[in-house]
């Protein structure tokens, strides 16, 4: 089982049709942007101030889990500033010349968006430093003894960097961003508003409780919410009257094996293995990998993060431990003979 099989994974690659739909329903202004109230308020002030001064917005770093709207926010920044957005990603910029070509084509105050900025090569990153600080491009012409450095002046611009792994950014790069924003998982209320708005833009008939139920199963992530909405739309069209209500959502997502808290078959299999085969743990990663027939990297990077974040498991020095939430979720009896680690965990 791999992550691309999971409908509730924010990392799952989207089809061309899904990308077209996502662009159509993506908010274009801060007024349309639901959730992230602190980020929205701060960016509104920073953008208004920059526009009043006729300056480029400070370089902005946006980080957080996948699917929370980093690309959407970069588009909104460009729209609100009334400038063009040029998009690229860290892995694409292999050589200094790749970045130089982008930078020299920017107009005044334009926004350059680099997704996965933590994956920039060191050579490209070095070129970026003077561009961010002094709006200058420092490049070498020629080779050997005849090589010389030339400086190219750049128009003022805004670099917006996005990453899911801010800890992998080098300090020199991170320190050059004047604005740093962290996107948090969305509340169910905010997600239900996003689902309702998307449904209306797609001309779908949806009830309030239908939108709320999709939101509850979306793991706090708009990308997942919009994907589930599209799948429920298909179910409502074929098996119902076309109206997306609570009953239709429940039947559609049950068919897709997405439970009321957003867990799928991989989450269920992991938790039940931990509780039923290993009495709740502690269990080492190697043992879980063998029991599930999954790669260790898949378990650590795909399955466990959401379970840990929601408090269903804990990682300890001795291994993985199921929490009281996990036992309650599956209505399982807590074993009588628990380890000291488990007793402490379940009493929290």
UniProtKB/Swiss-Prot annotation:
Record bears the keyword Nucleotide-binding: yes
Name of the gene this protein is made from: ruvB
Keywords per UniProt: ATP-binding, Cytoplasm, DNA damage, DNA recombination, DNA repair, DNA-binding, Hydrolase, Nucleotide-binding
Swiss-Prot/TrEMBL catalytic activity: ATP + H2O = ADP + phosphate + H(+)
Binding site for DNA: 315, 320
Listed name of the protein: Holliday junction branch migration complex subunit RuvB
Family: Belongs to the RuvB family.
Catalytic activity, EC: 3.6.4.-
């Amino acid at each position: 089982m791999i992550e691309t099989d999971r409908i509730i994974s924010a990392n799952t690659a989207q089809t061309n049709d899904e990308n077209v739909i996502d662009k159509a329903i993506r908010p274009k202004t801060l007024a349309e942007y639901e959730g992230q109230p602190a980020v929205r308020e701060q960016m509104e002030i920073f953008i208004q101030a920059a526009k009043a001064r006729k300056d480029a917005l400070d370089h902005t770093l946006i980080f957080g889990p996948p699917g929370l709207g980093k690309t959407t926010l970069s588009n909104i920044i460009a729209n609100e500033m009334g400038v063009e957005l040029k998009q690229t990603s860290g892995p694409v910029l292999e050589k200094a010349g790749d970045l130089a070509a982008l930078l020299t084509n920017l107009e005044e105050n334009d926004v350059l968006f680099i997704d996965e900025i933590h994956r920039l090569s060191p050579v490209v990153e070095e070129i970026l430093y003077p561009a961010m600080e002094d709006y200058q491009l420092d490049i070498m012409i020629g080779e050997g003894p005849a090589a010389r450095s030339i400086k190219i002046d750049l128009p003022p611009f805004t670099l917006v960097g996005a990453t899911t792994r801010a800890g992998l950014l080098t300090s020199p790069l991170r320190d050059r961003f004047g604005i740093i924003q962290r996107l948090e998982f969305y509340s169910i209320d905010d997600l239900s508003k996003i689902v309702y708005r998307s449904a209306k833009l797609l001309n779908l008939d949806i009830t309030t409780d239908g939108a709320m139920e999709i939101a509850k199963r979306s793991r706090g992530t708009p990308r997942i919410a919009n994907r589930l909405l599209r799948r429920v739309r298909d179910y409502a069209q074929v098996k119902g009257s076309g109206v997306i209500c609570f009953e239709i959502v429940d039947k559609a997502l049950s068919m897709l094996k997405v439970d009321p808290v957003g867990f799928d078959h991989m989450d269920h299999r992991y938790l039940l293995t931990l509780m039923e085969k290993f009495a709740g743990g502690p269990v080492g990663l190697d043992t879980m990998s063998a029991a599930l027939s999954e790669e260790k990297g898949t378990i650590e990077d795909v399955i466990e993060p959401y379970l840990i974040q929601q408090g269903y498991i804990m990682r300890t020095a001795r291994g993985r431990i199921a929490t009281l939430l996990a036992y309650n979720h599956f209505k399982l009896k807590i074993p009588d003979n628990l380890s000291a680690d488990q007793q402490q965990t379940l009493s929290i």
